[in-house]
């Protein structure tokens, strides 16, 4: 009885390790190849895909703004702020995280965004009604894009200008 119990444990271990390896290989293959088509806006890649393209689009929008005021990018979510800062490194634009709570960005960012022309990333999953909640001389849409994998939308971004940002409406 003891021998068959050890054999059962050994076989269970082999099966569990085998299933884990197959699952891991499938997950890595999907991550590298993106061969599974997910429903629109339900992709597991939405938090990691498209930031390079969004940074390039924001750079183009910033270049088209001829205002004499300083220009910067802005987001309202700290996790998105980290990604935008990283993918913006080749372009060198300032990024402000306006998430209305105390976090690490309040320590790292000593400059105030007041007086800047801020270009907000408004994505399908993280956006702010700039006109309604922020004090700006004017608000305008600078463009946008859909991010797709295998013909299915992963995320959408709209670039929204807040010209001469003066804070949050009370």
Where are these regions (language model features)?
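Structural signal for the C-terminal ends of transmembrane alpha-helices
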Residues: 1-7
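Short beta-strand scaffold positions
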Residues: 74-76
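Extracellular/periplasmic bilobal clamshell ligand-binding domains
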Residues: 102-115
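Residues that mark the start of a beta-strand
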Residues: 70-72, 115-117
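Membrane-proximal, lumen/periplasm-facing interface regions of secretory-pathway glyco-
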Residues: 9-69, 78-94, 100-103, 120-128, ...
């Amino acid at each position: 009885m003891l021998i068959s119990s050890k054999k059962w444990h050994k076989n269970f271990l082999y099966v569990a390790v085998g299933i884990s390896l197959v699952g891991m290989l499938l997950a890595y293959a999907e991550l590298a190849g993106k061969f599974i088509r997910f429903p629109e806006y339900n992709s597991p890649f939405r938090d990691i895909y498209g930031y390079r393209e969004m940074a390039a689009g924001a750079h183009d929008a910033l270049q088209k703004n001829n205002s004499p005021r300083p220009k910067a990018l802005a987001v309202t979510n700290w996790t998105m702020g980290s990604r935008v800062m990283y993918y913006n490194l080749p372009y060198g634009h300032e990024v402000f995280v306006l998430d209305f709570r105390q976090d690490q960005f309040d320590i790292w960012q000593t400059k105030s965004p007041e007086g800047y022309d801020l270009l907000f990333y408004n994505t399908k999953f993280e956006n702010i009604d700039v006109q309604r909640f922020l004090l700006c001389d004017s608000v305008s849409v600078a463009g946008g894009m859909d991010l797709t994998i295998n013909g299915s939308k992963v995320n959408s971004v709209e670039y929204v200008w807040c010209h001469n940002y003066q804070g949050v409406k009370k």
